[in-house]
Amino acid sequence: MRVVVTGWTGQVVQAMLERVPAGVEVVALRRPEFDLAAPKTVAPALRSAKPDVIVNAAAYTAVDQAESEPELALRVNGEAAGEAARAAAALGVPMIQISTDYVFDGTLGRPYREDDPVGPISAYGASKLAGEQAVAAATENHAILRTAWVYSPFGKNFVRTMLRLAETRDEIGVVADQHGCPTSALGIADAIFAVARNLTDRPNEAALRGIFHMVAQGEAAWADVAEAIFAEREALGGAPVRVKRIATADYPTPASRPANSRLDSARLAEIHHVRLPQWQGALSSCVRRLLTSQ
């Protein structure tokens, strides 16, 4: 199975390149030949890569910056996703689109299911929703995988930021009134490969297509995640760091974040037989890897 992925520098693609299963070849497209900011480059690059399945993990992910350049976010996350899906349809191959919890407004009192109403409250969220809609309109043979609170040993993410701040501080303020599912990019990579295999091996099963939520088991506030990071760091000999639990209002940002980013992944488990691990164990492994590799 030849998996062609977009988003060369992103956490998910770096994780996929590390976790390639036997019998799978991963081709990661990169600029300048493939540039989501220039959507007309998308189809030619995908055609030349000769995929069995396309995974669009590339995205404009600067959530706050998107508020000041929404057109660019929409072009990258919306228009280019549609171009990729049209290319997949023309090639007759499945398309996997990676999406986000930010398509919801965060007001629901339980974890979001796939059929709950969407309502993004940021330019980034709106652009990702546009991407979902463009993919669904362009090809029936798709799976849209929504994930949330992604971290990994790669790139910029919450775990690496907390560890960096801990080097110079003994107390760090962290938001305690946003709740979600911290999800390792390594677990996401494994899930993507499983879904890709299902789509390619069982092309006539319509149930395998559509929207699926893909997050680790369990839930937490950002402050809980920070406390778990610092506890692991301290267990490895680091100095104690105290988490000051603050409200979202105490840490204003240009883009609004959903207060509830919890996603229900039951459908992914039921249909694709994919279940990501509990967030605590995966987080511990990530922190240990980062600290012991220094």
List PLM regions with ranges:
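Amphipathic terminal alpha-helices
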Residues: 277-294
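NAD(P)H-binding glycine-rich loop region in Rossmannoid oxidoreductase-like domains
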Residues: 39-78
